[in-house]
Every structure is written in structure tokens, then in C-alpha cells.
Regions:
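Glycine-/small-residue-enriched transmembrane alpha-helix faces in small-molecule transporters
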Residues: 2-62, 98, 102, 106, ...
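Membrane-interface helix-cap regions at the ends of transmembrane helices
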Residues: 20-21, 50, 54, 68-86, ...
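Juxtamembrane helix-entry segments on the extracytoplasmic side of multipass membrane proteins
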Residues: 25-31, 54-62, 85-90, 162-183, ...
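Juxtamembrane helix-loop-helix junctions in multi-pass membrane proteins
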Residues: 39-69, 115-118, 186-211, 224, ...
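Specific transmembrane alpha-helical segments of multi-pass solute transporters/efflux pumps
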Residues: 40, 44-45, 73-123, 131, ...
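Specific alpha-helical transmembrane segments that line the substrate/conduction pathway
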Residues: 59-70, 100, 108-141, 146, ...
């Protein structure tokens, strides 16, 4: 069964909402999808840093959303519910569009004024936000294995980037990226809550044009004096962010979030900095350090504990 086929199609609304009671514990499909997203997300901070000298942060967010529309639309068209949203649920779309614009714009701004390595740490606080909110709002059960796995994976991230954190940076930029990570966590739980009413792919497709309008309005108001340049590196970086990150990652992650428990899925997000640092080590032919090995081991152990936490629970039909 593919992720597209796995998306629920019948419930209390014709747009295919997801019942919390039908959220599943992690399985091989969830882990494979999360690995894909984290691998592509791993290069996002570097891609943002590569282009911010040519394109202002808020404008960059708007452009990448424009590029992502065909990918998101194609994936949504392949789901059973396609683009349907009931009229009474359309009020959710602009709220999610605002969330999307604010989260990506703040990440871009913080990364442009800080360091990509530090951004990869502070943006990945979102699992620590999702876990308590998913218990409180979504009534998910988080077992001791999942909590231990969450702590292990987060410790692995700290080990991976300890040197970058100690090297210093712009505190204001760090705070902005930290807030972006918190926004992503809140947004994830709110999305999961809304999936009772609206299918994941439909919501993502319709919220994206709203985010585009907000970003272009924001760049007009706040970045009117910023320079816009066109370079080969900037074009490649923007295409990567639009197609791979906003297109593929956002679509796959939304479908995963609609099917699986938010807290367990969010913990897998700690793999993102591991992929980013490993990719940088490979590209630049850097030596494999003890911190990379230890960090990878802690993250891997954390992901394993999270994946097996609900294994004995009956999977809903």
C-alpha cells in the first residue's frame, strides 16, 4: 500500500477527514517517508544560506511556494479526495496559510542573519513542542519508550552540533529560528486537529496560495529596499527549496501526519540535522568525527525506541 492509497477517504465529511482514533503507530511506510523528508530537509538551511544574499528572506519564501504549487497539486490530484474542501471548513485555509508564511519567513530571516549549522538545531525543537501538545489536544498516548527515544534523539542532535553552538552566533537570529521551530510544532498539531475536517493534501494545496500572497505583501512592505539578484547558485538553491522541500517534503509530511500519530512522527524529525551534517561531511570530504558517530548512534537509538513504542497496540482497521 502506498501513502497516497493509505490516506483515509471516508468519514464524517466528503473531503476525507482523519479521526484521531484511527491514527496509527509508526510502521515501515512512516519511517521510509520520514527518512525521505529528513534527507531533503537536511539541505534546507544550507540552501537558504546560499541564496539570502541574492533574494530577501520573505520574498524567498514566496518564490519557493510558487515553485512548489505544481508538485503539491500533482500529489493532491493523486489522492482519493483530490482538492475537495467543504464550504463550512474553508475558514481553516487562511489560518494555515498564515502559519505557513510566518514559519518559513522567520526561518529564512533567522538563517540569513545567523549560521546554517545553528539554524539546523533551533528549527528542530519542534518535536519537543509537538509531544506535550499532542497529548493535551489530540489525546495521544506517549509511552516511556517514546519519551526515552525523544530524549536520546535530541541528545544526539546536541552532540552533532555542539561545536557549532559553542562557536557563537547572533542571539537574535537564534531566537527567531527557535520561534520558527516552535511555530512548526504548533502548526503540526493544529494541522492534525484540522484533518478531522479536511484532507491533508487538499488543505496544503489551498493554503499555499494564501501563503504566497502574505509573503509577497510582506516583502513589499518590509523588504522594499532590498536588492534582488539572479545568479546560478541562487536559482539552484531556490529550485531545491521549492521542489524538494516545499513541494515533496511538505506534501509527504502532511500525508504522514494525517495517517500517523503526531508525537511519534515528530520525533523522527530529529534525523534532519544528521542528514544535513553527514551530507556536508561527504561533499567536503571531511573526516568522520567521533561526535558524528555518537550523535548518529543516539539519534538512531531514539528513532528505534519511538518506532517500537506502540508495537503491541492493535492497529485500527
Amino acid at each position: 500500500m502506498t501513502l497516497l492509497e493509505a490516506t483515509p477517504t471516508k468519514s464524517t465529511s466528503e473531503s476525507g477527514p482523519v479521526s484521531f482514533s484511527k491514527s496509527r503507530p509508526l510502521d515501515a511506510l512512516a519511517i521510509a517517508g520520514a527518512i525521505l523528508c529528513c534527507a531533503l530537509w537536511g539541505g534546507n538551511a544550507v540552501a537558504v544560506k546560499a541564496v539570502v544574499g541574492d533574494v530577501p528572506p520573505i520574498g524567498l519564501a514566496g518564490i519557493r511556494f510558487c515553485i512548489s504549487i505544481p508538485v503539491i497539486g500533482w500529489i493532491a490530484s493523486r489522492t482519493p479526495n483530490k482538492f475537495k474542501i467543504q464550504r463550512k471548513h474553508w475558514w481553516l485555509v487562511p489560518i494555515h496559510g498564515l502559519f505557513l508564511a510566518a514559519q518559513v519567513s522567520t526561518f529564512n530571516w533567522g538563517t540569513s542573519h545567523g549560521q546554517a549549522g545553528r539554524s539546523s538545531v533551533f528549527i528542530n525543537v519542534h518535536p519537543l513542542v509537538v509531544t506535550p501538545l499532542s497529548v493535551w489536544i489530540l489525546h495521544e498516548h506517549v509511552g516511556w519508550k517514546a519519551l526515552t527515544g525523544l530524549a536520546s534523539a535530541f541528545s544526539g542532535v546536541i552532540v552533532l552540533v555542539a561545536g557549532r553552538l559553542m562557536a557563537g552566533g547572533d542571539p537574535k537570529a537564534d531566537v527567531i529560528v527557535f520561534c520558527s521551530g516552535c511555530l512548526f510544532g504548533i502548526q503540526s498539531v493544529f494541522q492534525k486537529w484540522c484533518y478531522r475536517k479536511v484532507a491533508p493534501a487538499s488543505l496544503l494545496f489551498w493554503q499555499t496560495p494564501i501563503a504566497i500572497l502574505i509573503c509577497f505583501l510582506g516583502t513589499t512592505v518590509f523588504e522594499s529596499e532590498a536588492e534582488w539578484k539572479v545568479s546560478q547558485s541562487a536559482v539552484l538553491a531556490i529550485m531545491y527549496q521549492g521542489l524538494a522541500v516545499s513541494g515533496v517534503c511538505f506534501s509527504v509530511w502532511s500525508l504522514l501526519l494525517g495517517r500517523y500519530e503526531a508525537a511519534s512522527l515528530a520525533a523522527l524529525g530529529f534525523m534532519t540535522p544528521l542528514f544535513g551534517i553527514s551530507l556536508g561531511t561527504w561533499i567536503h570530504a571531511e573526516p568522520v568525527t567521533s561526535s558524528l558517530i555518537l550523535g548518529a548512534a543516539l539519534i538512531g537509538f531514539g528513532v528505534y525506541l519511538t518506532a517500537i513504542d506502540k508495537r503491541k497496540r492493535k492497529v485500527p482497521a
